[in-house]
Design a protein with these regions (language model features):
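Structured alpha/beta or helical-core interaction and ligand-binding surfaces enriched in interleaved
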Residues: 1-248
């Protein structure tokens, strides 16, 4: 993917937003493309934040992490994910890193169930990344969410044969049940947790207004971290209060 294509894309986005007078003050830093599995991550993090235990389902969660080196590569990865056609429709997302205790800046993830699926998917994605973005873009397999590995370092171990490989602690099940019970009481028969706010309800082909507004936030983020590549994309980058607050 040539840099010129990304420059044209940003120009087109700006024209659409300006002509239609769309409010660019938007809260969002991630663009998802939903797969066949719904992970219920909001529920899992509620359990973790309350008790610092890792939910059972998260022990089979593996991700391919891709680390674009600049804002242009991040938008290229977004385009790759948009057209990515895998054997299974796996969830993927592009984002800018705003968590204070997590390293890195630009990231992409492909969600997998189990290490074997992650290894297989990485083999499939490697030539695609090489041909569309470049051979030097870092990519690797990680287990679950970074916060879990910080609280429980052995969780980061990928190899089940390693003595430090972490397995689910069965005593944590009661903690999960406590949160599930609380959530059921709160909603009283309604949908337990609505994760559709993270996704489009159906994956739409091509860029959406929501995508465009998140990309605007990415541009402001790039400016904040002094990524010089953002100057190639736009001379006027709208202010993002959502991103700015993340740096406080």
């Amino acid at each position: 993917i040539e840099d010129s294509k990304i420059i044209e894309l940003i120009y087109d986005i700006q024209q659409i937003i300006e002509i239609n007078q769309i409010n660019t003050d938007f809260e969002g830093s991630q663009i998802f493309r939903k797969g066949i599995i719904k992970y219920n991550c909001t529920r899992h993090f509620k359990i973790f934040n309350e008790f610092k235990v890792i939910p059972y389902n998260c022990f089979s969660c593996y991700k391919i992490q891709i680390e674009p080196k600049n804002i242009i590569e991040l938008i290229k990865l977004y385009l790759v994910f948009e057209k990515l056609n895998l054997e299974r429709n796996l969830t993927r997302k592009c984002m800018v890193e705003t968590r204070k205790n997590i390293s890195g800046k630009y990231k992409g993830y492909i969600y997998c169930i189990g290490l074997k699926e992650a290894e297989h998917t990485l083999k499939l994605i490697n030539p695609i990344l090489d041909n569309t973005i470049g051979v030097k873009i870092p990519r690797f397999i990680k287990r679950g969410c970074s916060e879990f590995g910080i609280a429980h370092p052995d969780y980061k171990e990928l190899d089940p044969s390693n003595k430090n490989f972490m397995k689910y602690n069965e005593t944590w099940k009661e903690k999960e049940e406590i949160i599930d019970s609380e959530l059921k009481e709160q909603v009283k028969g309604k949908k337990l947790i609505d994760e559709d706010k993270f996704y489009m309800k159906k994956n739409k082909i091509g860029i959406t207004i929501r995508d465009a507004l998140v990309i605007y936030n990415w541009l402001f983020y790039a400016q904040k971290i002094k990524d010089e590549n953002v100057k190639k994309l736009s001379k006027k980058i709208p202010y993002s209060s959502f991103i700015d607050k993340k740096f406080l």
